[in-house]
Amino acid sequence: MKKLLFLICFISTGVYAGGAYALYDYEQHEFQVSFNTYEVRPIASITKLFTAITILRSGAELTEKVKVQGKSGGHFPNGMMVTRHDLMKAMMVSSDNRAAETLAHTYPGGFNEFIRDANAYIRGRGLMNTSIEE
């Protein structure tokens, strides 16, 4: 019953409309059915979750103000000084892309270090076919 419920929930969230789905049996540790599971596609807002985790794991001071920067749209104008905490809220609640960009660019060690650390975390979770890129 759990498998069927999971599949129904998965389909009802619009994932099926995206052209891929999977039904995994956690007791047998195998997929019962799947479609297009290896097609490469953008992971959209899931990237923001990995961004938040990477920022929190870095120990970066969330009350520190950083300069907003980015090419994407967002709630904060470029050049504005905003705390990482407020950027995290905007990124997670409003799906603010510029907030995510700013957090990545103001990461301790810089943007390239953010990409390296985020991808190391992702690989450490066993997600070998998932990565964050610029």
Regions found by a protein language model. Give the residues of each.
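A general lysine-centric signal
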Residues: K2-K3, K48
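Active-site-adjacent loops and short helices of periplasmic peptidoglycan-processing enzymes
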Residues: Y16-E134
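Sec-dependent N-terminal signal peptides
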Residues: K3-T13
